[in-house]
Design a protein with these regions (language model features):
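S-adenosylmethionine
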Residues: 1-375
Length: 375
């Protein structure tokens, strides 16, 4: 899904360095505190103790939750300590399986009755019209007659949010710029009632086959599957009513699905993803008509992949942030350490496992005002 990675010039690297306090060695600590002691007469031991305590906590959390030091440093900047502990516990806890009803073939109520008849315990997702939570099942949930018949798709609850924010309408022309494996594409199709046209694009030819398979099983007939580099898609086709960019990311919000994320991601990985995301969001904006809508989402909770990408788009294209229409979630950051963002950044939405019982997600909704590019 992600295009071949390229080395970034130092001028283009985003700033996500750890603070000097976090990175200071013993000699740096001593020198810094000694200077402060000379100036204000305070006891350097108390300050060293506080720093040492924070470092020990960081090391303990890394050990307990299998994070590398870099990743834990980022998380400690995002959350107060007690909330960070709740986030880490929730992130390590398997959540119930979620499925999305395919309303092209059935109703959620009818699907629930079918599954209950098989001894499967389900409940509706209270903020979604299509979602069902599967608590336990005596049969493989991906091998029932209802599944094979296209009555539902396995899809995390958080993955429903970007399409809900997109709010596609019948007969529209919509682009899903990074579409594989097709969960969001088929969700868009059912909300459009199989009318209009969807262009489902992905850079990976292999993953395009997954889009095709899901469309076929779910009965989606209004979708054209494309195998192009999303960064250049605007050179091929424009004028879409709406564009969804569920961008490739580090996956920090879904570490339970890929625990290696916690131990292997580095500063360079974050920089590469952020750079790619910035290229993709400009292409997405250039693909949509004036007055059209772009929804940007990631399954990452890192600032550099979310608010920083939206801020980049605001500075280079004539777009504005608008309400997502989502009834829950935390506001995006208006300021964070040295970063100062547009006041409307609070209209973006952040989702966390410990607060919302979903995967970590970010959703932003933009409206295009003009095709002119900012310089």
């Amino acid at each position: 899904m992600i295009s071949p990675e390229r080395e970034l010039d130092s001028e283009r690297e985003v700033s996500f360095e750890r603070s000097p306090e976090d990175d200071a060695g013993p000699e740096d600590d001593m020198g810094s505190e000694s200077n402060m002691d000379q100036e204000d007469g305070t006891n350097p031991e108390s300050k060293l103790s506080a720093k040492d305590k924070r470092k020990r906590i960081r090391q303990e959390l890394c050990w307990k939750h299998d994070y590398n030091d870099f990743m834990m440093g980022l998380l400690m900047k995002l959350f107060p300590l007690e909330e960070l502990k709740r986030y880490l516990e929730a992130s390590d806890t398997e959540r119930p399986l979620n499925i999305r009803t395919n309303t092209l073939k059935t109703r959620r109520k009818d699907l629930a009755q079918e599954l209950i008849g098989l001894g499967i315990n389900v409940d509706p997702v209270d903020w979604s019209k299509e979602g069902l939570i599967v608590y336990d099942s005596p049969v493989p949930i991906g091998a029932t007659a209802s599944y094979l018949g296209g009555h539902y798709i396995l899809q995390g609850a958080g993955s429903l949010l970007p399409v809900m924010a997109l709010a596609p309408q019948p007969e529209e022309r919509i682009l899903d710029l990074s579409a594989a494996p097709g969960g969001k594409t088929t969700h868009i199709a059912q909300l459009m009632k199989n009318t209009g046209v969807i262009f489902a694009n992905d850079i990976s030819k292999e993953r395009c086959r997954a889009i095709s398979a899901n469309c076929h099983r779910l009965g989606v007939i209004n979708t054209v599957i494309c195998h192009k580099d999303g960064r250049a898609f605007h050179k091929l086709m424009t004028g879409f009513n709406r564009v969804l960019l569920d961008a490739p990311c580090t996956g920090t919000g879904v570490a339970i699905k890929d625990p290696s994320v916690k131990a292997t991601k580095t500063l360079k990985d974050v920089q590469r993803c952020s750079h790619l995301q910035k290229e993709l969001i400009l292409s997405a904006i250039d693909c949509v008509e004036n007055g059209g809508i772009v929804v940007y989402s990631t399954c990452s909770i890192l600032l550099e992949e979310n608010e920083c990408v939206i801020d980049y788009a605001l500075k280079r294209r004539h777009v504005k942030i608008i309400e997502t229409g989502l009834e829950f979630g935390r506001p995006g950051f208006k300021k964070f350490e040295a970063h100062r963002f547009h006041p409307k950044m609070e209209l973006t939405r952040r989702f966390y496992p410990h607060a919302h019982n979903t995967d970590g997600f970010f959703v932003a909704k933009l409206k295009k005002l003009s095709s002119k590019k900012k310089t």
